């Protein structure tokens, strides 16, 4: 019993002597790990163990056992994604515009061994790499591209960081440019450019409105002219139809009159009546000539009405003989 108590006391002393806080060089230490026999590794952490000063193994989350005298927890790596603020720095674009930029870098450890032995201070190294990469990428483009294609710029920075930080066991998930400052003169020039662009758009909209109004007026005038011409055409057609119908009616009336005259001539005494009518019209025609101031050649026997009637009858007889 005494021997057992003595062994327990020695073991307790040994455990107390091995629970000294560990000086972890990584700044992503979740808590102070202790060199004990029984160790509980939290989730999303990796403990790097050295045995007699040489890398031994990496403790996975859960229950782990170590030998406190010869084993030592050297590094505690946080496997969760973390955000690092990138300090403000200067950069010059390809068109010689000086900018002041800062950002946020999101990264995680994917290889605890490389993160522990590949670089002394991973966070500091990645921060410096992000700054130099951002200056390099900004120097390849002009100011307008920096504003228009910021997402592409972020992607290029992430690609360059991952390419350089692969031996460190660190992966850059994304990079975001947070703030961007430029000289006051450049800001004033950009403001003037914005105002000019607004005025240009306003002028374009106004000219388009004037053009649309002119087109609408022209379309209205065109339709009005078409309607007016159609109205004139319809009026002329109606007048022509009226005149044609009048001519047809006159011709039909004339034909009916001639037909009746022909029927009358076939009756007894019709020829004498027709001759008398012709003689009357003949004499009347000469009477009308006397009313006008025209120069005409008259027959010599104009003063003899009987001879004029005889001439009229002779004309009628000659016409009648021709028909026969």
Curated annotation (Swiss-Prot):
One GO CC term, this protein: membrane raft
The name this protein goes by in its record: Stomatin-like protein stl-1
Tissues expressing the protein: Widely expressed in most tissues, including body wall muscles, intestinal epithelia, and pharynx and head neurons.
Triggers of expression: Induced by anoxia. Induced by paraquat, a chemical causing production of reactive oxygen species (ROS).
Record's function text: Mitochondrial protein that probably regulates the biogenesis and the activity of mitochondria. In neurons, involved in mitochondrial fusion and recovery of normal locomotory behavior during reoxygenation; probably acts independently of egl-9 and the canonical hypoxia response pathway.
Organism classification: Eukaryota, Metazoa, Ecdysozoa, Nematoda, Chromadorea
Source organism of the structure: Caenorhabditis elegans
GO biological process: mitochondrion organization
Keyword vocabulary terms for this entry: Mitochondrion
Family: Belongs to the band 7/mec-2 family.
Gene field: stl-1
